[in-house]
């Protein structure tokens, strides 16, 4: 997709300073990451699916995925589009009998749905250029990425943007 790069969910971590979970998206084929601060329920929803946890009852995102399927639609892709006023934005792109439907979404909800439906996730190249973190060598630990990004945030000022 022009203007977008394919990303995968690299992991979910916890930012000790802000006491918030972070989902880390990794650009496919590169050592570039996009950290997105998310809520605790969405972090749990993403982690449970990534860890193949079996639950006795469906969670909200499981219910939404089942409803989309029962309506003969499918999640085609998730687009993480921008960061505006400290808020990330995403678009959930559905296919309903050949009709494209685009829904405004929080990235955390869209990602939680994507991991349940195996839908590809894409991030805007512009967003990645402005907010991504690139490592020269392969990173093994999610915590290293969070630490590196926290250090970047501590050193940056609004004038840098």
Model features per residue range: what roles?
Residues 1-161:
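Divalent-cation
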